């Protein structure tokens, strides 16, 4: 059997799990399809006995389909629009990202969490949830159970944010503009930002959704420097790319991140030339579906019992990051006169 044919059973299995997960994600956007995919994968893994037939395809999906999803994610970024609208929120975005990464780094040894899980929780909390985890996991060579743990933590606090933040914003007296920035900087995943802003709009008959989404997309750009920094750090630590001249940036930089940037530049250029943004909608949708497929593969490679036993510390780290980001986002708004 050829290499491609050996991958087919595992690919089909991930596809079959992704389809109901995608449907459930549409029904319950506050949870999201990636979480359903991981759950379905982990549940099936408890009973699944034909791993030899599907192993190669599952591994291919969790690595290469995931990287392809990140590349396609770039087609959802019009850099001109993001920079024009997101510049006001840039100081807040930088502050919240720096806070989450520093908190994750500082708490990792104290909580006795493995470095990869702490890194994934940090980038997932600070940048863009599942998409940031998807982009970072291959760079740091995270294991599937570490990815599943981080995604589960991010999901938990996404759900809490969507439920609590509209009432918190009202209690604090945030303006519509202030809440859009708050939701865009303090909520992790795009679907949860959408749910949070929509709940606020329903309460106040306003339109914060567009502003919150663009702030969120501006955060997504942080994937580039963060993944580059992590890849260089890992290369230096492992001494696997050292030459007489020093580091080779070409070898250190993950190629799929370069293609992500290229996709963003193509989108920006085409839209500036008058091409409708709707042209790229199908690629954005395909990116999301590929992430769901990859999460199904990660679920299939994850031990659910072990995840439950070892997940408490990761949840605590996620809570610390979440509270820190929330406080910094509000404090920065106050200092900048937005709130």
Curated annotation (Swiss-Prot):
Its main location: membrane. It is a multi-pass membrane protein. InterPro entries: UPF0324_pro. The keyword NAD does not apply. The chain crosses the membrane at residues 7-24, 28-50, 57-79, 84-106, 118-140, 150-172, 256-275, 290-307, 314-336. It comes from the Bacteria. It is found in: Cell membrane. One of its GO terms (cellular component) is plasma membrane. The keyword Transmembrane applies. Keywords: Cell membrane, Membrane, Transmembrane, Transmembrane helix. PANTHER family: INNER MEMBRANE PROTEIN YEIH-RELATED (PTHR30106), UPF0324 MEMBRANE PROTEIN FN0533 (PTHR30106:SF1). Belongs to the UPF0324 family. This is UPF0324 membrane protein M6_Spy0799.
């Amino acid at each position: 059997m050829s290499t491609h044919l050996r991958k087919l059973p595992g690919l089909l299995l991930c596809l079959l799990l992704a389809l109901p997960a995608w449907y459930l994600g549409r029904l319950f956007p506050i949870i999201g399809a990636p979480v359903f995919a991981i759950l379905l994968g982990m549940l099936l893994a408890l009973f699944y006995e034909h791993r030899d037939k599907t192993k190669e395809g599952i591994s291919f999906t969790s690595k290469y389909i995931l990287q392809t999803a990140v590349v396609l994610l770039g087609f959802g970024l019009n850099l001109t629009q993001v920079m024009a609208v997101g510049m006001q929120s840039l100081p807040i975005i930088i502050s919240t990202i720096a806070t989450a990464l520093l908190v994750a780094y500082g708490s990792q040894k104290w909580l006795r969490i493995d470095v990869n899980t702490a890194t994934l929780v940090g980038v997932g909390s600070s940048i863009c949830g599942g998409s940031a985890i998807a982009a970072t996991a291959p760079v740091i060579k995270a294991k599937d159970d570490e990815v599943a743990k981080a995604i589960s933590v991010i999901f938990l606090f996404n759900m809490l944010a969507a439920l609590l933040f509209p009432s918190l914003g009202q209690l604090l007296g945030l303006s519509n503009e202030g809440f859009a920035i708050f939701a865009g900087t303090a909520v992790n995943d795009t679907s949860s930002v959408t749910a949070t802003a929509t709940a606020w709009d329903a309460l106040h008959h306003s339109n914060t959704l567009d502003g919150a989404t663009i702030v969120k997309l501006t955060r997504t750009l942080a994937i580039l420097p963060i993944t580059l920094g992590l890849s260089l750090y890992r290369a230096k630590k492992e001494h696997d790319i050292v030459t007489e001249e020093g580091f080779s940036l070409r070898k250190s930089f993950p190629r799929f991140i370069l293609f992500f940037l290229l996709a963003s530049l193509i989108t920006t250029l085409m839209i500036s030339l008058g091409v409708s943004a709707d042209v790229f909608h199908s690629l954005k949708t395909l990116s999301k579906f590929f992430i769901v497929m990859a999460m199904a593969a990660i679920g299939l490679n994850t031990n659910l019992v072990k995840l439950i036993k070892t997940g408490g510390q990761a949840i605590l780290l996620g809570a610390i990051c979440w509270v820190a980001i929330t406080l910094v986002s509000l404090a920065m708004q106050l200092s900048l006169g937005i709130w």
